[in-house]
Amino acid sequence: MPKMKTHKGAAKRFKKTGKGKIKRRKAFKSHILTKKTPKRKRNLRKPTVMKNKAEEKRIKRLLP
């Protein structure tokens, strides 16, 4: 069986942590930022770990 290919679109958006969890960037941080509070924008800067197990499983399949 041939080697699995990495899904490049997913590889640019998600990273695997040391324990195998999926790390992602938060949405709503690219434009229309004037009405958002500084606290909200600061919290959007931090990466987060995926909580949805079904989505996490699907992403892991794209990142062998």
UniProtKB/Swiss-Prot annotation:
Keywords per UniProt: Ribonucleoprotein, Ribosomal protein
Q: Where is the composition biased (Basic residues)?
A: 1-45
Classification via Pfam families: Ribosomal_L35p
**Domain of life, per lineage:** Bacteria
Biological process terms from the Gene Ontology for this record are: translation
Q: Where is this region: Disordered?
A: 1-64
Gene Ontology cellular-component terms listed: large ribosomal subunit
Q: Cross-referenced SUPFAM superfamilies, in alphabetical order?
A: L35p-like
Kindly list the GO molecular function terms attached to this UniProt entry: structural constituent of ribosome
What's this protein's family per the entry? Belongs to the bacterial ribosomal protein bL35 family.
Q: What NCBIfam families would the database entry show?
A: rpmI_bact
PANTHER family in alphabetical order: 54S RIBOSOMAL PROTEIN BL35M, LARGE RIBOSOMAL SUBUNIT PROTEIN BL35M
Under what name is this protein listed? Large ribosomal subunit protein bL35
